[in-house]
Amino acid sequence: MLDKKYFLTILLFLKYLFLLRLTPDLEINRYISFFEQCSNFKSCINPYSQIDLLDKTYLTFPYSNLMYFVLLPFYFLGNVLNISFVNLSYLFFEVVLIYVLQKLFNVFLSNLYFILVLNPLIIYSIGILGQLDFIPLTFFMISLYYLKDKNKYYSIFFIILSLSSKIIFVILLPIIVLYFLKLDETLDENIRTTLY
């Protein structure tokens, strides 16, 4: 009989093989045309320089520049390997998220598999539809990890990455700022934290 750890690793591997064979709808219908504009260095740095050439019926890439730059290496790698860059980025960020969640909450890997890795809703929303919410979520969880370690500047940095990639995380910002201010021991530290 297979050890539980090996069984879960095989399940994870099979999921990744399955996802890498798919190309999400949003990637096909919206993201590809936006990323294909990146034909030279100048057009890659400013992806909106030729946006007037794209279909005007909807916003082609409804995310920030940060999300674009995060996905750009996955786009190039996906082109070389002939696989979906959205699913490739998901697999990368999922591995990072699993690692961070293990460190943050001292959770066994086997407990994360069925909640995160084998969750059909996550597989559908990312693998089939192509939603990119896992990237800012990973940044936010990394921020919480550094917050737990009382390393507030790294935490602030990853909160900024999270907010820059998806604005919805601004809802949690007041709670985290209050926690930062609670960690500070002097008024001078409070002022520096607030200004940072």
Locations of regions flagged by a protein language model:
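TM-lumen/periplasm interface segments of multi-pass membrane proteins
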Residues: 2-105, 124
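Membrane-embedded alpha-helical segments of multi-pass membrane proteins
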Residues: 88-96, 134-142, 165-172
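Transmembrane and membrane-interface helices of multi-pass
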Residues: 91, 110-123
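Transmembrane alpha-helical segments of multipass membrane enzymes and assembly factors
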Residues: 98-112, 149-150
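Specific aromatic-rich, kink-prone transmembrane helix
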Residues: 100, 135-152
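Membrane-interface alpha helices of multi-pass inner-membrane proteins
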Residues: 123-124, 143, 153-177
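Short acidic/glycine- and proline-prone juxtamembrane loop motifs at membrane-interface regions
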Residues: 127-135
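Perimembrane helix-loop-helix junctions
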Residues: 172-196
